[in-house]
Regions:
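Iron-sulfur cluster-binding electron-transfer modules in prokaryotic oxidoreductases
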Residues: 19-299
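Polybasic, lysine-rich low-complexity intrinsically disordered segments
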Residues: 14-17
């Protein structure tokens, strides 16, 4: 994200893709093996709205969609929350982790644990990175009992942005723009790992002028999958072509998603096809199109 923080945002100071390592097949795990991480998301209890939060910006937002990160900050500030952005934050470690570079991923994760060690919630405008914080750090540090305590704390304090706005801030948005037909793409991580795919829908449902249209590939992957799109470009390309065809076929005038990795792939395909349709992050759409009734109509 730009070094220039948003109003009230507190900046806390402090091209080659390697071949994936071979990993043992799941079938080779011992029969009595136990899962280190908690089960994937079920119903969870939510805290009261805090005065302060951390924002984890994500690599893709930092490099390709910095405006989405700034808009996420502004949405949180609009709800009266002070946003703290540790300047030394980097990657969540997922690219290395999913490529089999466990040791390298662990060191990246260890740095994030140190940066987000306070008691504040950690808000992440990405289901993918939030899933790494909330679930996969348990596996990375399964042999470090003392570190697992930090992991458990971080996991419990991690929220995807739409989830946090809806469940913790209890936002009530009012639509201020012209009526629009819109398609929502939910990432695989939000849908299958975090169980936050309905939160974006619920936020959009508050907006009387927004008609969310379903598309034929509503629950299917866009083909990004991080480094999967580079390692398996033919398969990824076929998947994103199916996705963009479905989005265009829905008749939507706008496309939104809560994950910028998906937007990177979807928008790249639109551009290659010569189509003018582009997707934007949910945070940017909400900031552009709403006022907040929960904070006295602040835009």
């Amino acid at each position: 994200l730009p070094s220039r923080p948003g109003r009230g945002c507190i900046a806390l100071q402090n091209d080659e893709i390697p071949e994936p390592k071979r990993m043992s097949p799941l079938s080779s795990a011992p029969a009595n093996a136990t899962r280190v991480a908690p089960p994937l998301e079920a119903a969870r209890s939510y805290p009261a709205k805090p005065a302060d939060v951390y924002l984890f910006g994500t690599c893709v937002i930092d490099v390709f969609f910095p405006g989405a990160g700034m808009d996420a900050i502004r949405l949180l500030e609009r709800e009266g929350i002070r946003v703290h952005f540790p300047q030394a934050q980097s990657c969540c470690g997922q690219p290395a982790y999913t490529s089999g570079y466990t040791d390298e991923a662990r060191e990246v994760a260890r740095a994030q644990l140190a940066l987000f060690a306070g008691d504040w919630p950690v808000v992440i405008p990405s289901g993918s990175c939030a899933g790494m914080f909330r679930h996969h750090y348990f596996e990375l540090f399964k042999d470090e009992p003392e570190t697992l305590q930090q992991v458990a704390s971080l996991s419990a304090r991690t929220f995807e942005l739409a989830e946090f706005l809806l469940e913790v801030c209890k936002v009530r948005f009012e639509h201020t723009g012209a009526p629009v037909r819109l398609a929502l793409h939910t990432s695989c991580s939000a849908r299958r790992e975090m169980n936050t795919h309905l939160h974006g829908r619920a936020l959009l449902a508050q907006l009387a002028g927004v008609e969310r249209v379903e598309h034929d590939h509503e629950s299917e992957c866009c083909g990004f999958g991080g480094s999967f799109s580079v390692r398996m470009p033919e398969i990824s390309g076929a998947m994103v072509q199916d996705k963009t065809a479905a989005l265009k076929g829905s008749g939507a005038a706008e496309v939104v998603s809560a994950d910028c990795g998906c937007l990177l792939n979807i928008n790249g395909c639109f551009e290659k096809q010569g189509d003018t349709l582009r997707g934007e992050h949910l945070a940017s759409f909400l900031l552009r199109r709403t006022t907040s009734a929960s904070t006295g109509g602040v835009r």
